[in-house]
Every structure is written in C-alpha cells, then in structure tokens.
Amino acid sequence: LKCYKLVPPFWKTCPEGKNLCYKMYMVSTLTVPVKRGCIDVCPKNSALVKYVCCNTDKCN
C-alpha cells in the first residue's frame, strides 16, 4: 500500500466519509493482502488480522 508515492494512472481516490485507504492481511500470510479499499476508521489489529492504513484518501 503506497500512501504518498502514487503511481499514475493506477491510484484510487476514496469517497467522502470513507476517506482512508486500507489493506487487510491475515497474520499467517502477511505478504498476501486479503482485502483493500476505503474505510472511515482504521480497524484495530487482532490475533488473526493485521490492517495497514493510510491517512490519505489517495493510494495505490
């Protein structure tokens, strides 16, 4: 997940209200993201799931 070095034309801009980009990983396979998208608040990590969030509304 790149927050500040955007690679055109592939970046995503998040909509109002869900303006943080995030990626979700399973802790057992940290190299393979399970899900990515936009969210309003960065979720807390758990024993099974790790979240990586940007504090911007644009990301790759």
From Swiss-Prot:
Effect the entry attributes to changing residue 4 to H: In toxin CM-8A
Subcellular location: Secreted; Target cell membrane
Tissue: Expressed by the venom gland.
Keywords noted in UniProt: Cardiotoxin, Cytolysis, Disulfide bond, Membrane, Secreted, Target cell membrane, Target membrane, Toxin
Main location: secreted
Disulphide bridges: 3-21, 14-38, 42-53, 54-59
Gene Ontology MF, one: toxin activity
GO terms for cellular component: extracellular region; membrane; other organism cell membrane
GO biological process assignments: killing of cells of another organism
Miscellaneous comment in the UniProt entry for this protein: The sequence of the major component is shown, it is called toxin CM-8 and the minor component is called toxin CM-8A.
Described purpose of this protein according to its UniProt entry: Shows cytolytic activity on many different cells by forming pore in lipid membranes. In vivo, increases heart rate or kills the animal by cardiac arrest. In addition, it binds to heparin with high affinity, interacts with Kv channel-interacting protein 1 (KCNIP1) in a calcium-independent manner, and binds to integrin alpha-V/beta-3 (ITGAV/ITGB3) with moderate affinity.
UniProt similarity note: Belongs to the three-finger toxin family. Short-chain subfamily. Type IA cytotoxin sub-subfamily.
Assembly behavior: Monomer in solution; Homodimer and oligomer in the presence of negatively charged lipids forming a pore with a size ranging between 20 and 30 Angstroms.
Protein's name in the database: Cytotoxin 3
Species: Naja annulifera
